[in-house]
Amino acid sequence: MRAVFDTNIFISALAIPGRRAETALLKVAEGGLQLAISQAIIHEVLDVLARKFDRNPEELSRVAVYLSELAEVVTPRRRLKVLRDEPDNRILECAATAKAEVIVTGDQAMLALGEYRGIRILSLKDFLAGVFP
């Protein structure tokens, strides 16, 4: 299964260990899932970690390398304007480019969308229950 994680999933996993988001990343690292990411998502993760969690440049560099090795980095060629929040559109672009089957998010606007071009949009709880019961 190919998946794209929203920025909030990465932030929860990287900044607040021991939660469901970390479990999801560990499953990816174990090879239980193919994950795709774009440079825009990586940049947003790094920006949030720097601003809200006071991570230093060395830590941010390690996170960038980790994410690039954990997931396939894709380059969306088309800009979408489906959701009001621009960073959410970057998630949709990544998922469409990667031909993902699922987007995992905690974002209510994305969850309300439910599906985009055949790509299911699930909460982390529903994703873990369905993929890694």
Question: For the regions a protein language model found, what residue spans apply to each?
Answer:
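Short, well-structured N-terminal submotif of metal-dependent ribonuclease cores
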Residues: 1-37
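Hydrophobic/aromatic ligand-binding patch that stacks against planar heteroaromatic rings
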Residues: 27, 94, 113
